[in-house]
Amino acid sequence: MKEFKVTTGPLPGSEKIYVEGERFPFLRVPMRRIRMSDTILENGEREKNEDVVVYDTSGPYTDTSYEVNLHRGVPKIREQWIEDRGDTVRLEGLSSEYGRIRQSDASLEKLRYEHVCTRPRAAKDGCATQLYYARQGIVTPEMEFVAIRENQLIDQVRTRYRAEEGEPLGAVIPRKITPEFVRDEIAAGRAILPANINHPESEPMIIGRNFLVKINANIGNSPISSTIEEEVEKAVWAIRWGADTVMDLSTGDHIHETREWIIRNSPVPIGTVPLYQTLEKVQGDVTKLNWEIFRDTLIEQAEQGVDYFTIHAGLRWHHVPLTLRRLTGIVSRGGSIIANWCTTHKRESFIYEHFEEICQILARYDVAISLGDGLRPGCIHDANDAAQIAELKTLGELTEIAWKYNVQTIIEGPGHVPMHKIRENMEIQLEACHGAPFYTLGPLVSDVASGYDHITSAIGAAQIGWFGTAMLCYVTQKEHLGLPNREDVREGVVTYRLAAHAADLAKGHPTAYWRDYMMSKARFEFRWKDQFHLSLDPEKAIQFHDATLPDEGHKEAHFCSMCGEHFCSMRANKNFRKLLNEEAVSK
């Protein structure tokens, strides 16, 4: 195996900081502080600007004091918290037959992560989930961690400014999020805190309508492209630019080993679609899929530390004929596999039939379930059709079953939906699925943007994020065309960070407005470096500016290359403001 190389170090103008807990003083919650320069007043005096603290998903990779060693993995920050709860036990060995086979295969030695845990954790009494704790009225360290993280020290801001209230459209956005608020949202099923007890490296985060909108980045090899090294680098690269979670959708060689490397080096929750690996185990023959192999795959991945599973349990046998009226049929990979199986065997899927047993497995490890939308529309023509809505209603029924077993649950959504149908989609989901968090792929608002689908989907993502979606699954410019590379991942993540931020602004999140306010102030005052550093992609902002004005002195100039020195509106504003102020003083 080649030597791993990942991108490390802070973003321009930023530094990693840690905030301690109050209830749990041992907590060290990571954030990114963007350093602001002084404002130069008309009289030449300097006025200090407050630094801006923002949410940070990058883990230890941007901490200059941390020595990166991918063969060792990132720190297991939750290990002691899990141990102290006393409700889990170390198993004598791997429970999955496939996991044991891979572990004993000497030919995989060079590919295998060196420090594989062969004694994973499981709940002593069958359940060790954050939902269970929340329902018992318990505030866990993970819950306080999340509360501190969501607030981004906004209560310490001293600058007086008029904050925009936003229009939350039914969401409840507190000025300050408390650990108790986090607990209550999880207990109500309106939010999840994905945190497998076998992924102690993960930094707690929350997905819910009443919190900051999150984004997911998909990575994964295919049978014809990519290596373990490339996928680990993609994961680290995605979180550097703001991915809150990462889904490993590998379908190629060494899925088990690739996933182990990713999890051990990931400070964010990792999701998978277990059905993909199950299909690989039967050499791609859908007819040979069965409950026993799928069950073993769930246990295998849960004991590795996967934090949430996409499971297409809501696609019923009688739903399949509804897709015959569609223009593009079933476009979900998981959905097409299940539909094929149901049609071949002329019965309900083994996933639907064994759903309660699935929940029992997930509760043992605190794996959240993302109920997959196997019948999501694959084109504008099919949006909000009978097949999509029928499955969504089934997902609502399954949500209640999952909650019965204290399994944290989110609902997956479309897809391709024109703008005028997006709000309706959100409203149907909220009612059918009892307020469980919605997790959508876009949606794409048009079908004609090949090569630009990150843009057409971000338009829909910003809207549905405002309407109530809790997490947005990114779409890259390679969507419908090919497997995304490293730069496609960056472009997709930053584009979706923008969509999520726009939704947060519309909903009235105070932290979102504060960052925009400080950007506008820096722009009006021609503090170019501060503008770069406050951007979602500082490196690209610097690159674009320097392409036409490369000299260091131009970063102090009161104009840019768009308008030039004599046509800059902000420069003109400053001039006539000065005149008006002088006139006011003279009067």
UniProtKB/Swiss-Prot annotation:
Query: Is Disulfide bond a UniProt keyword of this protein?
Result: no
According to UniProt, the name of this protein is: Phosphomethylpyrimidine synthase
Q: Give the residues the record marks as binding [4Fe-4S] cluster.
A: 560, 563, 568
Q: Which cofactor does it need?
A: [4Fe-4S] cluster
**Record pathway:** Cofactor biosynthesis; thiamine diphosphate biosynthesis
Q: Which GO terms describe its cellular component?
A: cytosol
Q: What does this protein do?
A: Catalyzes the synthesis of the hydroxymethylpyrimidine phosphate (HMP-P) moiety of thiamine from aminoimidazole ribotide (AIR) in a radical S-adenosyl-L-methionine (SAM)-dependent reaction.
Give the family from UniProt.
Belongs to the ThiC family.
Q: Which GO terms of type biological process are on file?
A: thiamine biosynthetic process; thiamine diphosphate biosynthetic process
Q: Which organism is it from?
A: Porphyromonas gingivalis (strain ATCC BAA-308 / W83)
Say which domain of life the source belongs to: Bacteria
